[in-house]
Amino acid sequence: MQRLRMYVMRADVTLEDVSDNFVRIGISGEQMVEELGKVMNAVPAEDDQVMHSGDITVLRVPGVQPRFEAYISAHEAARKLWDTLNVRGAPVGESAWRLLEILAGLPTVFAATSELFVPQMANLQLVNGVSFKKGCYPGQEIVARMQYLGTLKRRMYLGRIATDEPAFPGGELFTEADSEQVVGRLVDAQPHPDGGQAALAVIQITAAEASDLHLGSSEGAAFTLGTLPYPFES
């Protein structure tokens, strides 16, 4: 919060940490649209659309099935929403939500990866995650230069790691041809119901095209590229 306050340019703006004032619930599933409608005046129909109803704010987020994030500012409203969703839904935990984020091609930044990527490497320009028309933030000039003048050499890919062993953000990827050169880093990885780990990774484009990627070493678990739910820029 102290670092964020450095970028407040107007005297009448204040920043305050209100994390403890809200409950956040991730919601996913075809049936959940109907269940949300029982406590909301209207349910967001488009990705990135936001709806408010009393003490509940709901944001629709991209996904292979309907997904929402609910932010609730009152205890009773949170309890009512939870009890409503719990009839046809079930709590599944953070790992399941992170898997859905991975399958949607949405990057999450962790401490281990906070200084590794510029936004374009993590595909943020493809998912409405960064604006080149407005805003002021650290590194803005570098980001804009990459967008308008630079050549992107790394980008984020969806893939599957052929191991049930946990994989972690920042994990290194290698090719069989070069055991010394790190060609990619994991953004996140979570167990997939069909086995192995679903993962997002920022990888050198030339290395990704070679398709002989491995986690941890050139002889580690194979990393097989999948298909993101959105196209790369042409």
Identify the residue ranges that each predicted region occupies.
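Active-site/binding-pocket entry motifs
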Residues: 106-108, 192
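Acidic, low-complexity central loop/insert segments
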Residues: 1-104
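Active-site loop ensemble at the mouth of alpha/beta enzyme cores that anchors a bound cofactor
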Residues: 108, 112-124
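Short acidic/glycine-rich loop or secondary-structure boundary segments that cap or lie
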Residues: 79-80, 102, 109-113, 152-156
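Glycine-rich, small/acidic residue-mixed loop/short-helix segments
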Residues: 122-130, 144-234
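Structural motif
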Residues: 140-141
